[in-house]
Amino acid sequence: MYWKDYYDDDQPIIYVAGPYNAPTEMGIMDNIRKACEARDDLVVAGWAVVCPHANTANMDNENPDIYYRMDVKILARCDAIYMLHGWENSPGARMEHEMALEWGITVYYESGGVPQRRASADGLSKFA
C-alpha cells in the first residue's frame, strides 16, 4: 500500500456545519448523528469531508471557544461548507456561514441536497 495511490490533489474539501449543542445530552447526540450522516453522504458523493461534530463529540463542552478556534483554522482550508438544517439557530454555525461568505468559500445547504463532485471534460474534479 502506497500513500500516493490514495492522494487526489483535485478532491475538494467540504466542511459540515450545523447545530451541536442542545438542551439535553440526547439532543447533542442527535445533532452529532445528523452531522455524521451528512458526512457519510458527502464522502459517497466524492468529497473529502471535515465534520467538526465528530472531532469534538463527547469532549468537554464547558469552553466552546477552544473548539471554535480550531474549527476556524480548519474551515479556512476548505473549498466548501455544507450547512445542515437548523444552522440558523446555532451561533457557531452562523459564525462559520459568515466566515465562508467573507472568504469566498462555496456554500451548500442541506435543503438543496448533497452536492455531487463531478469530473469535467479534462478529467479534473469540479463542484456540481
Feature map (PLM): residue ranges:
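Conserved catalytic or regulatory cores that recognize and/or transform ribose-phosphate-containing ligands
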Residues: 1-128
